[in-house]
Amino acid sequence: MGVFAAFIAHGNPATSEYCSKAFIQSNRLESGQMVRVQQGELRVNVYRRSEVEIVKAKKHSGSIFDERYPSWWPSDKYPLKYVSEAERSVVPEYFVFWDRSPINGAIVTLISPEWFDESEDLSYLGDGWQPGFIDYDNQVYYDTTGRPVKWGPKSKALELSKLPLLIPNHEYDEKTGNIRLLCR
């Protein structure tokens, strides 16, 4: 079974040459780029953080919701005890997450002030927001640790909108710079 990959760089797809089987050549990503890899029925995103995003992530104090996950999520896929509390990562440079919203499985994707879906109501983001991830359907904006930080009227009162993005089982190979997605 092959692995489907699509790169998202500044809002445009890039090539799929960065993937082979269950390995993602994450060291070939530039900061601010994300690759999306099909794994079974779900897709996994790997985002390379900038130096500024890494510093900001390391300063994060965590959330009471970090260890919670939706009841519909398979219990064998979460929680992962090997990710750092602040960055929610195996290594600070990369954030690896399932592309589905913890609310209802809607798609979560990369967003930046330079490019976004202009047909969507983003008034809840206010001014000065940074690149991060967004669930357009439920109006939830996540920082680069995958924690929700802004909510629109559709999700503000939903407890599931307070949950962080879900992290797949994976490991980082320091010698090659590859991320390996682990299947259960």
What positions do the PLM features span?
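Short small/polar-residue motifs
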Residues: 20-24, 30-33, 163-171
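General detector of N-terminal leader/presequence modules that precede the first folded domain
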Residues: 1-30
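Extracytoplasmic/periplasmic/luminal assembly and interaction segments
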Residues: 30-87
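A residue-level signal for beta-strand positions that form part of recognition/binding surfaces
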Residues: 21, 34, 43, 132, ...
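Rieske [2Fe-2S] iron-sulfur-binding domain
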Residues: 62-183
